[in-house]
Amino acid sequence: MRDTPLSNCERLFLLKAIKEKKRLDGRQTYDYRNIKISFGTDYGCCVVELGKTRVLSQVSCELVPPKDSRPTEGIVFFNLELSPMASPAFEPNRQSELLVTLNRQLERCLRNSKCIDTESLCVVSGEKVWQIRVDVHVLNHDGNLMDAASIAAISALSHFRRPDVAIQGRDVTVFGPEERDPIPLSIYHMPICVSFAFFLQGSFLLVDPCEREERVKDGLLVIAMNKHREICSIQSSGGIMLLKEQVLRCSKIASVKVSEITELINKALENDKKVRKEGGKFGFAESMPKERITTLKRDEAPVEMTDVKETADDIVQRTETTTETVPSPILVATGTAQIGEGIVNSWGLDEDEDDELQTEDRKTDEVVVITDSEEEEVVILNDQKSKKTSKQK
């Protein structure tokens, strides 16, 4: 694991802020960061966001032979992975001390606490049992990976559904979700880890430390507890000596935090179950906030609606068509009818057209006087008549 160096100025600034009971993100000493739990479209897929720390948990199952020491119990397997995508400090394909510690702590919290009924996972004693595999992937590391991993793992186990089976003799039939409804796991309680970081030789205490606060810590205490105030595991690291009063104080704080987180998990499970039952949209895509560009957004212009009715009435009155009187035919004789008697004749010409016709008639009645110049330009069409007139002269 390649640790990113922390400058002395940053270290001194963090320790000075902790002495003054201040934190980088504005939280109080015992405050958790915002926790968001969302489930995928498939059962057993869960993403937990603890501030900027993001963890994905996926649960799967398969039929395997049981262990020789426990032929009537199923198998629960946990696997936690740290990829360079989460932090540049994580090296690929190499088990670091942090990875081994997190895996052991997760198994001690969930498997050794007997929170899952492993006997209900037995299909055929000594032959077939269900193996439940929990894969936890760290998507982004911003401190307190243990708490986020425990919340994601127990939420995914509570959300998971295994296929139903039928046994006829030695034949085992596994039904798909279309044939029979999947069966949820039998979970007795929900153990959740709560981390406490100690600074300056145990003089100061912080709950849910972030990544920078973890770099300057002197010791770490992780308490796994359920909402019934039952301690499932306790682990201390860092080589710091803690007093009995400090441990009891941390356990009281952990009981309050665990009850709040358990209520949040149950609420998220109920909401997902309700949405699936109603046939609504569910999955990671619906839980992610939609970020849209709002630079070109225009504010709605105010519209006055006071005189709308009056103007509408005026428009209707203007556009109303005038009722035309249609004459009824008058029967003059057999086979002859007269239409339009007693109505003004609309076939006549307009006054302007009458004026134009009168002016044209006046122009045609006028006498045209032809001058000498115009006589020379006259073309004679009949040659014979012109010859006779010349002889008489």
Curated annotation (Swiss-Prot):
SUPFAM superfamilies: Ribonuclease PH domain 2-like (SSF55666), Ribosomal protein S5 domain 2-like (SSF54211). Disruption phenotype: Morpholino knockdown of the protein affects brain and neuromuscular development. Morphant embryos have small heads, small or absent eyes, truncated bodies, and reduced and damaged myofibers. Motor axons fail to migrate properly to the neuromuscular junctions. The brain has abnormal morphology, the cerebellum and hindbrain are absent. Residues 1-268 are annotated as: ARE binding. It comes from the Eukaryota. InterPro entries: ExoRNase_PH_dom1, ExoRNase_PH_dom2, ExoRNase_PH_dom2_sf, Exosome_comp_Rrp42_subfam, PNPase/RNase_PH_dom_sf, Ribosomal_Su5_D2-typ_SF, Rrp45. Keywords: Cytoplasm, Exosome, Nucleus, RNA-binding, rRNA processing. One of its GO terms (biological process) is U4 snRNA 3'-end processing. Non-catalytic component of the RNA exosome complex which has 3'->5' exoribonuclease activity and participates in a multitude of cellular RNA processing and degradation events. In the nucleus, the RNA exosome complex is involved in proper maturation of stable RNA species such as rRNA, snRNA and snoRNA, in the elimination of RNA processing by-products and non-coding 'pervasive' transcripts, such as antisense RNA species and promoter-upstream transcripts (PROMPTs), and of mRNAs with processing defects, thereby limiting or excluding their export to the cytoplasm. This is Exosome complex component RRP45.
